[in-house]
Design a protein with these regions (language model features):
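Ribokinase/PfkB-type carbohydrate-kinase core domain
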Residues: 1-131, 146, 150-165
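Conserved single-residue anchors adjacent to enzymatic active/cofactor-binding motifs
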Residues: 135
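4′-phosphopantetheine-dependent carrier domains
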Residues: 142-143
Length: 165
């Protein structure tokens, strides 16, 4: 990432951010994890080059339940890498690039989500305080329970909370 900042008065604002994706296997760190002790394997791929094809293959070969979510960016979709995973979480735009149709949870922001042909309404948020991270909260709640409605509720609670980094 390269960020460019602008100062106006006493405040500094992010003016521009340029993200680069590097999927070269040779530049990725060696991931040496014994996956046999885990019940499920969940990947949140933020497209920084750490989730490489050999690790995706290792996850599939572990014989565990697998989940994948990938960061939306201006780069072409990388969901093709996760077609063989048991569950995929993506937004509507990304869902159009996926041939797999079962066990795909499509997030729709304030419009809720859909999974396996069922729509799940979002929970009303009167005073959104912090929307950054709502998708991560949704994904964590979905992983914990497998319930898209519960995940929507937790994401709404998060948006209304005052969470500071």
């Amino acid at each position: 990432k390269t960020r460019y900042w602008v100062t106006h008065g006493d405040a500094t604002y992010k003016y521009l951010q340029i993200n680069r994706v590097n999927d070269e296997e040779s530049l990725a760190p060696v991931i040496d994890i014994d996956l046999s002790s885990y019940d499920i394997i969940a990947i949140a791929d933020y497209r920084c080059g750490f989730v490489i094809d050999s690790f995706v293959k290792q996850c599939l070969e572990a014989g565990k339940i697998t989940y994948a979510s990938s960061q939306v960016s201006s780069h072409p979709s990388n969901y093709y890498r996760y077609e063989d995973f048991d569950y995929i979480v993506c937004n509507e735009r990304e869902s159009k690039t996926i041939s797999k149709k079962d066990n795909v949870c499509i997030t729709k922001g304030s419009d809720g989500c859909s999974m396996n042909g069922m729509d799940y309404a979002s929970y009303k948020v009167d005073n959104p305080v912090n929307i950054i991270g709502a998708g991560d909260c949704f994904y964590a709640a979905l992983l914990a329970t497998g319930d898209p409605d519960f995940a929507n509720m937790k994401a709404a609670e998060y948006v209304e909370s005052e969470v500071y980094e």
